[in-house]
Regions:
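A cross-family phosphate/adenosyl-ligand binding-site feature
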Residues: 1-296
Length: 296
């Protein structure tokens, strides 16, 4: 017989906290009509795990791909699909710290870039641009579409939005498509954008993992270090907004894709990578957590 799960102190809507990087940040998760909308309940939960208070705005086309109840459950609040007497797109009484448009469709991107505000979503984003212009909020968009729609019109619209202070999150490009990035990647971009940490923008070098020394063409001396500590340090710095570079000794653990990293397969490679980084003079600080070989 399958046993029942152990009891939990969490309610059905609660999430297990991963960090406080988005603590006390009000985030408008703006869901437009791309197929990637089906992933947004998990995205909302991820943002909440980092401390965000998330309100979902969904277009009618988005609700073809994701259920309104699923978004309401994942955000633990009602989904806004229409504008009423409260003028939800203005959010004057309780303004948002950031607007994350994910997925951002071709149609939505081009409408917002040209100032069209003829739907609840585009009206919300017109207001968001006004708040960005006043340095009151941040606007991030994650473009998703088939590669054939990635044309000059789209490029010019994205450049226009960037010139207005919008952060364009690079898509995960696979199989001829601009795909929505992984949830942790989106959470990282959001955290870095809203961060007020003194580490924001600082260049920091981190090392981690083993540095094997070859005995011959087959055997080598190494240790049990995995590099988890170095990855954890680099990830924390990344979420705080630092420009972090990680040199990771080859092990069974791979750093997340959003971290700028190099893999060192030997002590000699590690030494060369570290010295090259330090000689560049671009780093404000360095944290050395690698298990450097001491048996040469």
């Amino acid at each position: 017989m399958l046993p029942a799960p152990p009891p939990s102190s969490l309610s059905d809507h609660d999430v297990v906290k991963l960090s406080t990087h988005l603590e006390n940040k009000r985030v408008a998760l703006v869901v437009t009509g791309g197929i990637a909308a089906y992933r947004t309940p998990d995205l909302a939960r991820t943002l909440r795990r980092h401390g965000a208070e998330v309100t979902a705005f969904a277009s009618s086309d988005a609700l073809r791909y994701v259920a309104e109840d699923a978004l309401a459950w994942s955000t633990n609040r009602a989904v806004i699909t229409q504008l009423g007497y409260e003028a939800e797109h203005l959010s004057d009484a309780n303004p948002f710290d950031a607007y994350l448009v994910a997925p951002a469709t071709y149609n939505t991107i081009n409408k917002v870039a040209t100032g069209i505000a003829d739907t609840p979503i585009t009206a919300l984003l017109a207001s968001a641009l006004g708040r960005v212009d006043r340095n009151e909020a941040h606007l991030l968009i994650a473009p998703t579409m088939h590669g054939t729609m990635h044309n000059q019109i789209l490029i010019e619209s994205l450049e226009r939005l960037e010139s207005l202070g919008t952060t364009v999150i690079p898509p995960r490009q696979e199989n001829g498509k601009d795909n929505i990035p992984d949830h942790e990647v989106l959470a990282g971009w959001l955290s870095r954008t809203v961060s007020d940490s003194p580490l924001k923008g600082k260049r920091i070098l981190v090392t981690g993992g083993p540095t094997p020394v070859a005995i011959d063409g087959i055997r080598r001396l190494t240790n049990k270090f995995t590099g988890r500590l170095g990855i954890a340090i680099a990830t924390e710095l990344y979420f705080r907004g630092a420009a972090v570079s990680l040199i990771h000794g080859s092990s069974g653990i791979t750093p997340p894709s959003y971290l700028d990293h190099q893999i060192a397969t030997s002590f000699d490679e590690y030494q060369t990578m570290v010295l090259n980084k330090l000689e560049s003079g671009e780093f404000k600080a360095a944290i050395f957590s690698a298990a450097v070989a001491d048996y040469r």
